[in-house]
């Protein structure tokens, strides 16, 4: 049976400043922690990435031609405030005005994120969001943007608060590269949620036009053996780290008893304590009903087993399938030997997980208002067909189709889902995989920066026109 998506559904493509723009030191942009981290640890940098800083008119023309009517863009904080505060870089401000103008000219609605993994280096060195001064600077930056860019109708404060804490302090694959520090993980989550709440409250108090929300990565966690209490507990604890703690802060304005019990257990085993003030709870509570929408980024699910032992994570950055290991002291271990297809990077392809996660939000957080799927897509070692100047990415089409199908099911079952943004619009730079891992509708030749629509782009165009998942 053919499934249909609503007539007002957004068929979007997603980007992020640092992964797309390039121009990392151009026109007064300040440094971010990633600049130094990549120079010191990797064989690639984010220069020139997809050169979106100069080529955005090309990408937006392609968007219009291929039926993409929404784009996720992030503003690079250090392009506006090179140090994160203080002096404004006027050239950066002009760039984003020009970019948003081009979006509207091409009938592509910009959904704009204020922070996508790129805290200015000056603030990052000073503790990033573990330092509460960064919260104040972020709110000042947010207020500047709300005032300066009234042409933006859809704002999100942060992209993926969970993976920031996880990447910086648990897995250690983001700067500053700290591993297994649960105190820092939860404190980062919490402080960023306070920053989010303050920005949302300010947006509403000052009556800015438009809508505001937040983008959370919500990977679904299942027990490997649902009849084994240890596996069930491991899935619950892993869910608290990645999903429940942050969702509670967003929509309950506090942390539920089960959430705090899980956090205290993890910290008692690993050491550390969480600092939360009454003022924090007050602002979380004041903001909990003010989010106009939730952005859900979903790529994969995980299966958890009970585990007694030390923390050890091996991150698969090469795309050699089977290279991953993930076990956390006091939490559990991920089981990769499950009967579910997975990518070369060991990401479990499980569309049902997206359905389950959407319906979990609907059930547990009824004040969610509406949902956009703000990222979903398939990372692949695309093979470019020189003769036909395209990529025959049938696996990507199949992946998108399966996930859109469960979105249609969730809508039919009462979820208010208003749009889908494919990660990514064009091929972009990947944080921990460089230029090997491609996601785009449009193939980018990173040598020449030419764009070539993939087979998936033609499929997406037909989908956007018919709204039918075929």
Swiss-Prot record:
D-galactose 6-phosphate binds at residues 19, 116, 159-160, 297, 430-431, 437, 439. Pfam families: Glyco_hydro_1 (PF00232). InterPro entries: 6P-beta-galactosidase, Glyco_hydro_1, Glyco_hydro_1_AS, Glyco_hydro_1_N_CS, Glycoside_hydrolase_SF. This is 6-phospho-beta-galactosidase. It comes from the Bacteria. The keyword Glycosyltransferase does not apply. PANTHER family: GLYCOSYL HYDROLASE, LP05116P. One of its GO terms (biological process) is lactose catabolic process via tagatose-6-phosphate. It catalyses: a 6-phospho-beta-D-galactoside + H2O = D-galactose 6-phosphate + an alcohol. Its EC number is 3.2.1.85. PROSITE patterns: GLYCOSYL_HYDROL_F1_1, GLYCOSYL_HYDROL_F1_2. It comes from Staphylococcus epidermidis (strain ATCC 35984 / DSM 28319 / BCRC 17069 / CCUG 31568 / BM 3577 / RP62A). The gene is lacG. Transmembrane segments: none annotated. GO terms for molecular function: 6-phospho-beta-galactosidase activity; beta-glucosidase activity. One of its GO terms (cellular component) is cytosol. Belongs to the glycosyl hydrolase 1 family. Keywords: Glycosidase, Hydrolase. Pathway: Carbohydrate metabolism; lactose degradation; D-galactose 6-phosphate and beta-D-glucose from lactose 6-phosphate: step 1/1.
């Amino acid at each position: 049976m053919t499934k249909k998506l609503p007539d007002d559904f957004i068929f979007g493509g997603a980007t992020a400043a640092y992964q797309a723009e390039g121009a990392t030191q151009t026109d007064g942009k300040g440094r971010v922690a990633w600049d130094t981290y990549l120079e010191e640890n990797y064989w690639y940098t984010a220069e020139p990435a997809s050169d979106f800083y100069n080529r955005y008119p090309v990408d937006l023309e392609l968007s219009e031609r291929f039926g993409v009517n929404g784009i996720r863009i992030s503003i690079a904080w250090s392009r506006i405030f090179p140090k994160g505060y203080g002096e404004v870089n006027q050239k950066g401000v002009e760039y984003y005005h020009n970019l948003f103008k081009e979006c509207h000219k091409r009938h592509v609605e910009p959904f704009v994120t204020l922070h996508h993994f790129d805290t200015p280096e000056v603030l990052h060195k000073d503790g990033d969001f573990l330092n509460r001064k960064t919260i104040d600077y972020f709110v000042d930056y947010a207020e500047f943007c709300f005032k300066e860019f009234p042409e933006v109708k859809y704002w999100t404060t942060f992209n993926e608060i969970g993976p920031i804490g996880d990447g910086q302090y648990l897995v250690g694959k983001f700067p500053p590269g700290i591993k297994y520090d649960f105190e820092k993980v939860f404190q980062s989550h919490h402080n960023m949620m306070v920053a989010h709440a303050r920005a949302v409250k300010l947006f509403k108090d000052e009556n800015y036009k438009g809508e505001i929300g937040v983008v959370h990565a919500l990977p679904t966690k299942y027990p490997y053996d649902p009849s084994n209490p240890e596996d069930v507990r491991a899935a619950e604890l892993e869910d608290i780290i990645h999903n429940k703690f942050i969702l509670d802060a967003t929509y309950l304005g506090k942390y539920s008893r089960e959430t705090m019990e899980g956090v205290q257990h993890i910290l008692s085993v690993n050491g550390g304590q969480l600092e939360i003030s009454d003022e924090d709870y007050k602002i979380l509570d004041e903001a909990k009903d003010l989010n106009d929408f939730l952005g859900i980024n979903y790529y994969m699910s995980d299966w958890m087993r009970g585990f007694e032992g030390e923390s050890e994570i091996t991150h698969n950055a090469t795309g050699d399938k089977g290279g991953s290991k993930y076990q956390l002291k006091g939490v559990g271990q991920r089981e990769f030997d499950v009967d579910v297809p997975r990518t070369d990077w060991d990401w479990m392809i499980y569309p049902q997980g997206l359905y389950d996660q959407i319906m979990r939000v609907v059930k547990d957080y009824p004040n969610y208002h509406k949902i956009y799927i703000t990222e979903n897509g398939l990372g692949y070692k695309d093979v470019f067909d020189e003769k036909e100047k395209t990529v025959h990415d049938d696996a990507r089409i199949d992946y998108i189709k399966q996930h859109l199908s469960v979105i249609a099911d969730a809508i039919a079952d009462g979820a208010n889902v208003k749009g889908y943004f494919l990660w990514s619009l064009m091929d972009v730079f990947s944080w921990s995989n460089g230029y090997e891992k491609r996601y785009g509708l449009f193939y980018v030749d990173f040598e020449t920066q030419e764009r070539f629509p993939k087979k998936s782009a033609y499929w997406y165009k037909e989908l956007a026109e018919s709204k039918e998942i075929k």
